[in-house]
Structure formats: structure tokens, C-alpha cells
Amino acid sequence: MSLRIDLTDRHKTHPDSVREHAVEKVSKLTRYFDQVQHIEIILDKEHDQHAVEVIVTANRHLHFVGHATDDNVLTCIDRVVDKLERQVVKAKERIKDHHRGDGARKQA
């Protein structure tokens, strides 16, 4: 299973360094959840504010969405990745806890 990352610029073309930073940061989400299949990064600029939205799709039809706005696009990217890390870790814990039952206790 390969990870596909799509990056879209809206209203402005961002420099390659910003695009590389975004791809590098979101790629780290696979550390927390290895079932990530697709990541869509949307970089936007309206007026003086940058907006970054990241949509992560994983196995079992799981979707995670993070959004941030700031004057600095790099700060936006970092904030979005932090939000998504929390979402992904929480979802993984929920899946892990769901599979952990009272199996041995029920038999006794």
C-alpha cells in the first residue's frame, strides 16, 4: 500500500521550500498510524492570512481533517500537523481499545 500526497495551491503559488516543508511534515503522520493511504494538502492565501487544510484518508474509511490560519504559512502547516497528530493518535487508541475486550473474564 503506497501513500499518495496531493498538494494544491489556491490563489497563490507557494515556493518549493514551503511545499517541501508541508509534504515532509504530513508524511510523519504515518509514524502514528500506518494505515494512512492518501493525504491532501490545500494551501490558500486570502488577504493577509494563509490558510492550510489537510485531509487524511486511512483504511476502514477513516478521515481526519485539520485546518489552521495564520500570517505565516509555515506556522499554519505546523499547527495543522499537530492537530492531525492528536486526531490520529486518539483514533488509533480507540481502535486498540475496541479490540481489547474482557475475553478472559467472561469465560471465568
Question: Locations of the language-model features?
Answer:
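N-terminal, polar/charged subdomain of small-to-medium soluble alpha/beta proteins
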Residues: 1-108
